[in-house]
Amino acid sequence: MENKKFYITTPIYYPSDNFHIGHCYTTIIADSIARFKRLSGYDTFFLTGTDEHGQKIEKKAKECGVTPKEYVDKIVDNAKDLWASLNISYDKFIRTTDKEHEEVVQKIFKKLYDQGDIYKGEYKGLYCTPCESFWTETQLDENGNCPDCHREVHEVKEEAYFFKLSKYQTWLEEFLESHPDFIEPTSRKNEMINNFIKPGLADLCVSRTSFKWGVPVSFDENHVVYVWIDALSNYISALGYLTDDDTLFKKYWPADLHIVGKEIVRFHTIIWPIMLKALDLPLPKKVFGHGWLVIDGGKISKSLGNYKDPREYINAYGVDAVRYYALREVPFGSDGNFSEEALVTRTNSDLANILGNLVNRTIGMVNKYFDGKVTNTKIYEDIDNDLIDYATSLKENVTTLVDNLELSNAIDKIFDLFRKCNKYIDDVTPWILVKDESKKGRLECILYNLLECIRIGSVLLQAFLPTTAERIFKQINTKETSFDTIEKFGNYESPNTVNTPEVLFARIEK
């Protein structure tokens, strides 16, 4: 079989302050997809990191009385600790202050300049420092402020280098037309085409002289490379592009999936494709722009300061409660409201009631009725068919949903199996069967069916709630945890002895 590869990225986050639940949301989703692909047999590379240059960080560091590098080092250490506490399984964490990255950026800038795609000119425009974005008069909000963060913009005028986006306008339009799935969801694609591309692409300012915290332009020391050529290059610099060792680049590029927030879709679907075209490199297969998590209708953001440390939620409710909420609550692509109350409700209704209760009841019955040991007696009845059919088709159905980036539906599909198991218990009434000695073999088959369904669901759950899946494997005492063990029913060990049940998720009283 052909060696399957999968390269997935989060955006590189801007470490102007500690990360919030919005950063966690993006990263948990990317991590779950990466884990699912690994479990499905893909040679997977999962990249995340930080975009550390720019005027805003230079200014923040000055206010704190430290160098920009000292400032970002502290934030990055905090971010890595947060990712560890969320079980984020990235293969590489790239920083734009890494020497290797800076050298690649300089080479890319020089290459584009040498071939005439970058030229020197003068920039006049309106600049939003918090967003690091330039705007025209017509793009400002009704108060004349930044349309993204609604803060004041400042007029700037300075010598700058420009990237000829306009040269590639027709090519980009034709590319998007011939690759309809490149930008998802469709609403973002339509927004890019109608609001940004069709009105005409202006050449892009790609250097600055008004601050120094950035990658120096190698042939003009007065300039630093402005954010997007620096930041976007991370996806290829992380793989060793234009270095002595480009093994990873040859192996994994082009990326299969860039996951980004909707506010940076335009940079990833206009500037990035044009950069790659100018460098004569293949384009990523898909850019998915997800929605925002909102609090009381407003975006959770560092600049608004309307959030608390995500570790408070992890410490209060457990890592997998936070992961489950992020994956299940909001259909990927839409905006969704974040509330601690909803997190508690989800934890109680789904994790404690549906899953926790099922595992506890099943192991409890095996211990009570069969001293903890169960064998597959294969004394099936018609009532088993629906459950077994659902369980054996689950991998294929969940895989389709993950491939379509329907993460909320994918995890709900797994929980549908657990719901069916709970209903199955109510329908087959083990507590009545146990009173009839002649039904003992049938009762044992029922409990085996339940343990096998719990195993199958948990094998898939590994991608989303890895800690919980491991705890379930331990409690039901199985080593059959790979994806290829769940295509047919009956791979749970037989005979087998279960372990003592433990509470997976305690009900939260609020």
Predicted regions and their residues:
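Basic, alpha-helical terminal appendages of large translation-related enzymes
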Residues: 1-5, 45, 49, 121-126, ...
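Structured secondary-structure scaffolds
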Residues: 2-48, 95, 100-104, 149, ...
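A non-catalytic, amphipathic alpha-helix used as a structural packing/dimerization or gating element
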Residues: 32, 70-81, 107, 354-361, ...
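Short, charge-patterned binding micro-sites
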Residues: 50-56
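A charged helix-plus-loop insertion that forms the helical arch/lid used to bind
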Residues: 60-73
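A broadly conserved sequence feature marking short terminus-proximal activation segments
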Residues: 71-127
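Active-site-proximal binding-pocket segments
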Residues: 265, 329, 333, 342, ...
